[in-house]
Amino acid sequence: RDFCLSRGLGDVYKRQPQGIMAVVKMKNNSLSDMLAGNPLLILVENLQDPGNLGTILRMGEGAGVTGVIMSPNTVDIYNPKTIRSTMGSIFRVPFVYVQDFSEAVTQCQKAGVKVYAAHLDGKNTYLGEDYSTPTAFLIGNEGNGLTDGITKQADTLIRIPMQGEVESLNAAIACTILTYEAVRQRTI
């Protein structure tokens, strides 16, 4: 078979390409598959930094998340920087882009998943919640956070306590803290 490759494809490896290339089939996951059992989900709304999305997928594999659900305006998961930052997790973590993010949140809730929004206005700290049951964490845009509509859909707004003058954490870091607290609770 002959393949025509884009010039930008080489940007995946900046300096020392290994001369290896692979052709893989794009995943076709469904939200309903991710809702089975006792799901631990990450719901990503309008994230724009490919490194953040890749880090979330990589962390998700390490934490054993059931899936990553993304809004249509989230950065392309097949962006070379995203792929590179997943360190291969893109091939092992279920993910799906949904056309109607609000409806996806509703579907999660109807399936018995409690949806938590990482939010600066959260009254509760993340440590005071029970994540041993079906759980999803909403993670918003790096600069703007979650949209008002999605924030209102959340079952509970939670926050990570901050010291000093820091207002918030990087989206991938915040997601990691929340997800690993859920993992800790599920393994006690």
Regions found by a protein language model. Name each.
Residues 1, 96, 158:
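General small-molecule cofactor/ligand-binding pocket signal
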Residues 1-13:
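Single conserved hydrophobic/aromatic residue that forms the stacking wall/gate
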Residues 5, 43, 116, 158, ...:
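Conserved Rossmann-like nucleotide-binding pocket used by diverse enzymes
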Residues 11, 104-106, 168-171:
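Short, charged, surface-exposed secondary-structure boundary motifs
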Residues 19, 62-63, 77, 82-90, ...:
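Structured adenosyl-cofactor binding patch, chiefly the S-adenosyl-L-methionine
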Residues 22:
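Glycine-rich phosphate-binding loops that contact phosphosugars or nucleotide phosphates
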Residues 29-122:
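RNA substrate-binding interface of SAM-dependent RNA methyltransferases
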Residues 116-166, 170:
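Active-site/ligand-binding-proximal alpha/beta "capping" segment
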